[in-house]
Each structure stands twice: as C-alpha cells, then as structure tokens.
UniProtKB/Swiss-Prot annotation:
This is ATP synthase subunit c. It comes from the Bacteria. Belongs to the ATPase C chain family. F-type ATPases have 2 components, F(1) - the catalytic core - and F(0) - the membrane proton channel. F(1) has five subunits: alpha(3), beta(3), gamma(1), delta(1), epsilon(1). F(0) has three main subunits: a(1), b(2) and c(10-14). The alpha and beta chains form an alternating ring which encloses part of the gamma chain. F(1) is attached to F(0) by a central stalk formed by the gamma and epsilon chains, while a peripheral stalk is formed by the delta and b chains. One of its GO terms (cellular component) is proton-transporting ATP synthase complex. The record marks 56 as: Reversibly protonated during proton transport. It is a multi-pass membrane protein.
C-alpha cells in the first residue's frame, strides 16, 4: 500500500514538470512582448495571467488526482 502511494506522488512530481515549464514559457513570452511593445503591456498582462491560470489548473488537478487515487 505505501509503495502505491509513493508511486502516485512520484508520478505527480514528474507530471508537474509540464505545467512548470509551460508557466515559464508563458512569462518569457510576456516579458519579450512587453520589451518589444511597452504600450501593449496591459493587454499582454491579462493574456499572460489567463495562460498562467490555465497551466496552473493542470497542476492542481494533477495533485488532486494523486491524493484521490
């Protein structure tokens, strides 16, 4: 039983790498966009925060499933 629980947590840890990389790419693109066009900062910020929330939701769903299963 304990081995199954540990395997679930290891699986979640590996699965969390994807959203982590995705969030990094989202904010890298945001910073690059603001550096190119500072006047579009407010519009780009809203899009970046929405992208962050969607990517983070994947990680939250993953940890919920790791605890349930």
């Amino acid at each position: 039983m304990a081995i199954e629980g540990s395997a679930n947590m290891i699986g979640y840890g590996l699965a969390a790498i994807g959203p982590g990389v995705g969030i990094g790419l989202i904010f890298a693109a945001y910073i690059s966009g603001v550096a190119r066009q500072p006047e579009a900062q407010s519009r780009l910020q809203a899009i970046a925060i929405l992208g962050f929330a969607l990517a983070e939701a994947l990680a939250i769903i993953g940890i919920a499933l790791a605890f349930v299963l």
